[in-house]
Amino acid sequence: MTLPLTFSPEVAEARAAGAPLVALESTIITHGMPYPQNLDTARAVEAEVRAAGAVPATIAIMDGRMHIGLTGTELEVLAQADGVAKLSRADLAACLARGGVGATTVAATMICAALAGIHVFATGGIGGVHKGAEDTFDISADLRELAHTPVTVIAAGAKAILDLPKTLEVLETLGVPVIAHGQDAFPAFWSRDSGLPAPLRADSATEIARAHLMRSKLGLPGGQLVANPIPEDAEIPASTLAPLIVQAQSEADAKGVARKAVTPFLLNRLFELTDGATLASNIALVLNNARLGAAVARALTT
């Protein structure tokens, strides 16, 4: 049985030429923001990758196939679609088998990227250990995927709504390299400094690429997480966000929001509580990660 992979013309041409490729997720399009802002942002992120010298490969499941790179029409269809499944490792195969449509989370995007031979993936922030996980056991599949699938993930750290100390502990237990780019502190998505030190630091895309290649040579499974801090002019201080996150989490608990619905609920409430500031910061950090992702992809191909 052949893999149900469909490459966009742009990605197919890049693969044939050995050009640098950067995978992009699709959950940010379907679950991250409303239309048409989601479409505009997706186009802007792809343009940022191209401007930085690489080829973007936005990944989504459509008609039961893994689409590696989306055409302009496909991107627009996905941006306006309703009821799109949010796919991770557990439900990716089932969606493909039934010929469904789905947006890929960090974990699912990593799987598809690896199958397509793409080694770098730029996203906003990874999932992790949710607050209260000692009772709910709500831990994102993204963490184990980082330990399993050989893709370097460029993100602004883990989402600030999570339990960041526990997230870092789990990543350490799983043997995942956590590398802060250009600073010693582990960033917290909308904020440059979480108050926690990053285990590792790299100051250039070349260093990050070399670490990726060395892991492969050593036969070590999994990828690496590159924590790229949000640009200074776009950050929201952690001290400003902390009480709002507590409020949003309390509301989620009161409403019985659970499992995959938790993150979208919290992000939406924080958007409302900050009068849209979190969304503006989110867009800025994704664009920043796209630029670094392109630089790492270029370094891997030289």
Swiss-Prot record:
A GO molecular function held by the record: hydrolase activity, acting on glycosyl bonds
Q: Which Gene3D superfamilies match?
A: Indigoidine synthase domain (3.40.1790.10)
Top enzyme category: lyase
Cited SUPFAM superfamilies: Indigoidine synthase A-like
| Keyword Lyase annotated | yes
Instruction: Identify which residues the record assigns to the active site.
Output: 25, 159
Q: What do the Gene Ontology cellular component annotations say?
A: cytoplasm
Q: What reaction gets catalysed by this protein?
A: D-ribose 5-phosphate + uracil = psi-UMP + H2O
UniProt cross-references to InterPro entries, sorted A to Z: Indigdn_synthA-like, PsuG
**Annotated binding of substrate, by residue:** 86, 106, 140-142
The prosthetic group or cofactor this protein requires is: Mn(2+)
Q: What is its EC number?
A: 4.2.1.70
Q: Protein name, please? A: Pseudouridine-5'-phosphate glycosidase
- Organism name: Jannaschia sp. (strain CCS1)
Task: State which gene encodes it.
Answer: psuG
